[in-house]
């Protein structure tokens, strides 16, 4: 690890030198490129320099103990004890900082939520989940835009698709893919029995045009009048867009905007994200040995979390985390869950190093 850290520090120092070169400073693109590289390496270098200071202080404390002065020895032993506690903590932090970065982490998100088993109750739960993620995004200063939705009469959603744009959106939300389960007494239930319903969540990184090429010849594009709950037409203009990707059979549609052009752009965003996910899963299947290390990959059969209303409980089954603060969680306070998931999967990756 030390060798790797020294390499990173040398690279950082070279980049810092390069940034002070007037030629680079006057070239905006070059300057931005090196500044980004420097910013990426800075946390590792800062932590490594802290680690080197700790090693030096340990060495000095050990020298003091050997010196034979009783007063100095007592002080040095106390300091050494403290330093030896700090050292493994910093080593762990450095290991985490050296983990390979997921290139998708800085991407915006395409969020897809679909009602699963449970009829109207599942649709209401899908709406609860969408509100939870929208509130969480708002707390982070991210932007949420609905691309397509299929509302039900009671305020639920059979399906809702949205983009979430903001720094680090995918890195935080990528472990939310999977089956979410709710246990509660439905508003439609007269006998007061607890029902179990589900909704599936898919979190995809938004794909740029450079990430995936789509041949226009492979697309069939239909336009239609947008509709509201129950299927009634709410717009006489043919502004809604449905795109069929012929080779894969993927169908996406968008009717959220009044403009056909904007609806087409949004639908293409979803199509690109889904095609990129297919590519990723294909590569993942080819590397079967790595599959264990891939988490939250959107396996729809995987039940990841239960929201139990009578017990005010949320349980994430992957990491065995249980919180008794359901209302706060559904109001978007999910940092505790997300941070625990990130820490867990970082630890899993460290085992593989």
UniProtKB/Swiss-Prot annotation:
InterPro entries noted in UniProt: PCRF (IPR005139), Pep_chain_release_fac_I (IPR000352), Pep_chain_release_fac_I_sf (IPR045853), Prokaryotic/Mito_RF (IPR050057), RF-1 (IPR004373)
N5-methylglutamine modified-residue sites: 232
Keyword check for Protein biosynthesis: yes
Protein name in the entry: Peptide chain release factor 1
Gene Ontology CC entries for this record: cytoplasm
HAMAP family listed in its UniProt record: Rel_fac_1 (MF_00093)
Domain of life: Bacteria
MF terms (GO), sorted A to Z: translation release factor activity, codon specific
Known function: Peptide chain release factor 1 directs the termination of translation in response to the peptide chain termination codons UAG and UAA.
Post-translational modification remark: Methylated by PrmC. Methylation increases the termination efficiency of RF1.
NCBIfam families referenced in this protein's UniProt entry, alphabetically: prfA, PRK00591.1
Cytoplasm recorded as keyword: yes
Keywords: Cytoplasm, Methylation, Protein biosynthesis
Similarity-based family: Belongs to the prokaryotic/mitochondrial release factor family.
Subcellular location: Cytoplasm
Primary localization class, coarse: cytoplasm
One Pfam entry name: RF-1
